[in-house]
Swiss-Prot record:
GO CC aspect terms: membrane; membrane raft
Any one GO MF annotation of this record: structural constituent of myelin sheath
Name used for this protein in its record: Myelin and lymphocyte protein
Described purpose of this protein according to its UniProt entry: Could be an important component in vesicular trafficking cycling between the Golgi complex and the apical plasma membrane. Could be involved in myelin biogenesis and/or myelin function.
Domain of life: Eukaryota
UniProt organism field: Canis lupus familiaris (Dog)
A Pfam family of this chain: MARVEL
PTM comment, free text: Lipoprotein.
Topology class, membrane: Multi-pass membrane protein
Gene: MAL
Length: 153
């Protein structure tokens, strides 16, 4: 019974169908916006390292994990097994929670940077906050639809 469920519409895509199915299409946008977050924070020279260290960890970790999952899905490493659907749902739920915490901390750090930091650092961190919240939204949407797929598998 399990192989029939795995071969249904609720299984993970493989090959280039990853780029045409929802929510897996969101991998591309998570990759782009997550990459922008850590690039912007790194280019601002991490003025508040205690807070922004967590933001950097979350953004780089999620960037690398998203890239790894995307490559594994493209090469079809999951083989249609339900355990990969569970992994996908768990990863995106954890990533959404991590990104939410990182976004709040980055916004707090940026508010505190209004005075005493360069104009360039301040504006790079404003951009990082915006992209961090966009990445959070993408991971939340992906998590919700991954949980729906997990429940139906």
């Amino acid at each position: 019974m399990a192989p029939a469920a795995a071969s249904g519409g609720s299984s993970l895509p493989s090959g280039f169908s990853v780029f045409t199915t929802f929510p897996d299409l969101l991998f591309i946008f998570e990759f782009i916006f997550g990459g922008l977050v850590w690039i912007l924070i790194a280019s601002s020279l991490v003025p508040i390292p205690l807070v922004q260290g967590w933001v950097m960890f979350v953004s780089v970790f999620c960037f690398m994990a998203t890239t790894a999952l995307l490559v594994l899905y493209i090469i079809g490493a999951h083989g249609g097994e339900n355990s990969w659907v569970t992994l996908d749902a768990a990863y995106h739920c954890i990533a959404a929670l991590f990104y939410l915490s990182a976004s709040v901390l980055e916004a707090l750090a940026t508010i505190g940077m209004q005075e005493g930091y360069t104009y360039k650092q301040y504006h790079e961190n404003i951009s990082a906050v915006v992209f961090s919240y966009v990445a959070t939204l993408l991971y939340v949407v992906h998590a919700v639809f991954s949980l729906i797929r997990w429940k139906s598998s």
